[in-house]
Structures are given as structure tokens and as C-alpha cells.
Amino acid sequence: MERWFKSLFVLVLFFVFTASAADKLPNIVILATGGTIAGSAATGTQTTGYKAGALGVDTLINAVPEVKKLANVKGEQFSNMASENMTGDVVLKLSQRVNELLARDDVDGVVITHGTDTVEESAYFLHLTVKSDKPVVFVAAMRPATAISADGPMNLLEAVRVAGDKQSRGRGVMVVLNDRIGSARYITKTNASTLDTFKANEEGYLGVIIGNRIYYQNRIDKLHTTRSVFDVRGLTSLPKVDILYGYQDDPEYLYDAAIQHGVKGIVYAGMGAGSVSVRGIAGMRKAMEKGVVVIRSTRTGNGIVPPDEELPGLVSDSLNPAHARILLMLALTRTSDPKVIQEYFHTY
């Protein structure tokens, strides 16, 4: 009988200490949306032609049991698609769900698994619309989960580490891949295939993860999250904004088509510092006469588009075309005043 009581006492102590340790860990929700990180292929050497969004969130979490030493994790399957199929309506609902989660006292941060092709767009949308300073971290992968040396598991582990760290609060939405922590405002995909594809060439990264430790190096001055004026919690749809590309012989009829399809805004991915051909100028002016807001950006990948009174439209500041489209959609939910919208682009 005495031995039985001793065994029971040890068992009770074990559960008490286990529960105590779990209570000290941050509570992180992992929202899965699909992408290559949840991709599956026929063989371990196949890194193209795989099916994105084939695996569920529980499979992703169970593949990295170490995450449970970093946080109390809970998985939620929000969607399961290749990110080229992500739409504004889905991202709007994603932002609303994240806001719901972060409003809870029992949630300390959110990790979102996503495809690499459009992760910068989704991340920037949430960067402008999440109303909390709790960490929100997007994570992705360039190789499917079934690949030899898949990058997804380590990326997921590091994303949970970042989301659970108190230093991560108030930094806006972040994107974590390959040991680097990028701001959603600046990060962009720069290579179609290589692992080290996400960069912020001009501005640099927020930090890095080395040897299981987070080293933050920068903060951004641009407004975001709790300091953003954009609130989508009650929205059901977003204004339609298209991107038109500038190139030799770019035709005016592209603007005609956009106008006919009822766009509210056009982002021009221009040559150089937002240069526009005579055909593009004619198209822009025609669109602006119809009340369409036009933003000039650059197709170069880096640099600021400065104001030019001789050219029509507003300027994107340092936002690339994909990011500029996100900001213009949100701006149009509040105003169509060009002066106010231009100030948004210099502020966010």
C-alpha cells in the first residue's frame, strides 16, 4: 500500500510540474492556408509539379514535435490552396479571423502558413489591418513537405519561436523563412525557385534566428497594425484594383479594358522610376476622368517613385506594385480623395 501511495504521489507531481511548464509557455494558434509548405509530391526528389495545399495543419505540426517545447500550439485549417488562388475576399476573412483570435486573452500570437507566391500580399494586408500588437508571423516554404531536406519544418519551428517571443510584440506582421525575419512592409519574393528568395534589399531584415536565439536588429517607422487607420472587421468586400504593366509598345486599350470592368483603382508597374509612355499617359488620364485612382509604381523591384507633376497619377513611394495594390484597395475603403490617398502611401 505504501508503495502504491508513493507511485501515486510521483504521478501527481509529474502532472503538476507538466501543467506548470505548459502554463509558462506562450499560446500560439497556427492558421494553415495551404501552399508549398503543405505540398506533397510522388518522390522525395520532386520539387516541381507537386500538389500545393495537400497536407492538413495537424500533419504539419506533428512533423515538428519540437514546436510543443516552444509554445502551446493549436492548429486551425483556415483554407488549403495554392497561394496563386488566394483572393482578396479570402485574405479579408483571414484578417478578420486573426483579429478575433488576438482579441482573446488566451492567445499570445498567431502563425499563418501560406504559399510563397503571394505571401507578401497577404502579409502586408494584415500588416495594415490587424488591430493588435501581438505577434503575427507568416511562414512558407520553397520545397514541398515530402521533399528531401524540405525547408518547411524548420521555417515553421522558427516562426513559432518568433511568435512566442516577447520581443516580437509591436513589430507589425512578419514573414519568417530561412533564419530571417522580414517585415511585411518590405519583404518580397526575388527568385522563382531558390530557398533564399525572400529579401528586403533596400531596407534590410528585422532580424535573424541563429542557434535557437532571435536577434532583432531593426524596427520600421512606417505605420502599421494598431496605428493603422484601416479597419476591415466589418467589411464584406474590397474595391477592385488592377495592376497594369509598362513596357515598349504598351497599349492604351489596357486602360479601356480596366475601366470597362469597373475597377476603382489602377496600379501602374512602370519602367524605371515610374516612367509612362504617351499611350500610358492617355490611358491614365482617361481612367482618372472616370474617377479611377491611378498609382505609379516601378517594375524594377527596388527604389522610390518620386512625384512628377508632368505625369498623371499618384506615386507609390517605395511600395512595389503588389504591395501598392493592397494599400490602394484599403485606401479606397475610406476615401477617393487623391491628396489623402497620396499621404497614405507616404505613411504606410
Swiss-Prot record:
Residues 26-348 form the Asparaginase/glutaminase domain. InterPro entries: AsnASE_II, Asp/glu_Ase-like_sf, Asparaginase/glutaminase-like, Asparaginase/glutaminase_AS1, Asparaginase/glutaminase_AS2, Asparaginase_C, L-asparaginase_C, L-asparaginase_N. Pfam families: Asparaginase (PF00710), Asparaginase_C (PF17763). It comes from the Bacteria. It is an enzyme of class 3 (hydrolase). GO terms for molecular function: asparaginase activity. The sequence of strain NCPPB 1066 is shown. Belongs to the asparaginase 1 family. This is L-asparaginase. It comes from Dickeya chrysanthemi. The gene is ansB.
